[in-house]
């Protein structure tokens, strides 16, 4: 895969660093280097993004990692690795930011589950707006939450796929829900994907946890 033209839209360097390190943990340095080469990201071999919140990790780079995982490991294997990378990014980088940092406080812990989500999901969306160029909105419905990404880094530049591909975002969302809820797992399903031709990437979160 050749290098894609840069988007000019960015995630913080730290998000890129954690994504790359989480993949190295699973597949080893040689496996990671193969993914980086395949995605046109050889400049990150032995030269990871810096550990800071500067906007320096281009959306095309995250998209290239996702598509390279699929290409090398197949849709199922790539999906699992991308979900893991997304979860790791939340656990290592995001849960201590802003309103999310208060999720372990007693005053928050004793709130009813849906109240936690009403506070936590918009707070999570706001963090992306503050730290990155990702634009996210949240809408509450009767039995579900709708999490919408209007400029999506996970599938930036991709077209012509027949199924949603934004598994890094799915993993981020799953782990954020687990953190905010105090340990529950929720069903998260990507229902729309820009790479499929949809105008946005949309994720449906069932309000009732599965565990």
For each feature predicted by the language model, list its residue ranges.
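Short terminal or interdomain "cap/linker" segment that borders an active site or interface and mediates
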Residues: 2-18, 129-170, 178-211
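Short alpha-helical "patches" and their helix-cap loops
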Residues: 31-42, 79-85, 106-111, 182-195
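N-terminal low-complexity or simple alpha-helical regulatory segments
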Residues: 2-84, 89-92
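Amphipathic interaction/junction segments at domain boundaries or subunit interfaces
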Residues: 54-165, 178, 192
């Amino acid at each position: 895969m050749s290098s894609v033209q840069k988007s000019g839209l960015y995630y913080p360097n730290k998000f890129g660093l954690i994504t790359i390190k989480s993949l190295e943990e699973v597949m080893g340095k040689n496996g990671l280097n193969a993914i980086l080469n395949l995605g046109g990201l050889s400049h990150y071999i032995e030269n990871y993004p810096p550990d800071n919140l500067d906007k320096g990790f281009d959306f095309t780079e995250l998209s290239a990692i996702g598509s390279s995982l699929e290409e090398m490991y197949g849709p199922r294997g790539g999906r699992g690795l991308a979900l893991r990378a997304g979860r790791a990014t939340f656990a290592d980088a995001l849960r201590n930011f802003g309103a999310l940092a208060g999720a372990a406080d007693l005053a928050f812990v004793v709130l009813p589950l849906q109240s936690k989500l009403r506070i936590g999901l918009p707070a999570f969306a706001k963090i992306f707006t503050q730290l990155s160029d990702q634009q996210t909105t949240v809408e509450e419905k009767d039995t579900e939450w709708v999490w919408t990404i209007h400029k999506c880094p996970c599938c930036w530049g991709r077209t012509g796929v027949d199924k949603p591909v934004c598994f890094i975002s799915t993993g981020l969302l799953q782990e954020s829900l687990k953190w905010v809820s105090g340990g529950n797992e929720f069903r998260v399903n990507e229902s729309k994907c820009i790479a499929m031709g949809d105008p946005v990437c949309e994720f449906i979160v069932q309000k009732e946890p599965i565990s």
